[in-house]
Curated annotation (Swiss-Prot):
Designated name of the protein: YcgL domain-containing protein A1S_1688
Gene3D superfamilies assigned: YcgL domain
Pfam families: YcgL
Organism the protein comes from: Acinetobacter baumannii (strain ATCC 17978 / DSM 105126 / CIP 53.77 / LMG 1025 / NCDC KC755 / 5377)
Lineage top rank: taxon: Bacteria
UniProt domain YcgL: residue ranges: 1-92
InterPro entries given in the database record: YcgL-like_sf, YcgL_dom
Disulfide bonds: none
UniProt cross-references to PROSITE patterns, sorted A to Z: YCGL (PS51648)
Length: 101
């Protein structure tokens, strides 16, 4: 399964994978986001193209299970990769130099 990956303008490390089932035999330029609900597009913000990728069940992806991605691409036409959790701890103690700033 071929797909294009776009980065979100609203949230760091949020990506959307868009299915390209007819690649490389596509004859016309269709709207790549036509299957993505409007509410998802609003939350995602401006999409910036990152790369084209060919996915297979044996391929490893850094943060998501490729089987979940493939299933979503086949059933919905897209997959949203959310930012990793736990990178910023809102309860962390402030560094010494920033207290009271």
């Amino acid at each position: 399964m071929h797909c294009d990956i776009y980065r979100s303008s609203k949230k760091d490390e949020m990506y959307i994978y868009i299915a390209r089932p007819n690649y490389p035999d596509e004859t016309e330029q269709a709207d790549p986001f036509e299957k993505v609900p409007e509410a998802v597009l609003q939350a995602f913000g401006r999409a910036t193209f990152v790369m084209h990728l060919e996915l297979a069940p044996t391929r490893k992806l850094a943060r998501v299970n490729v089987l979940h991605v493939l299933d979503s691409l086949q059933t919905k036409g897209f997959f949203i990769q959310m930012p990793p959790e736990g990178l910023i701890n809102p309860n962390a103690v402030e560094p010494e130099g920033l207290r009271g700033a």
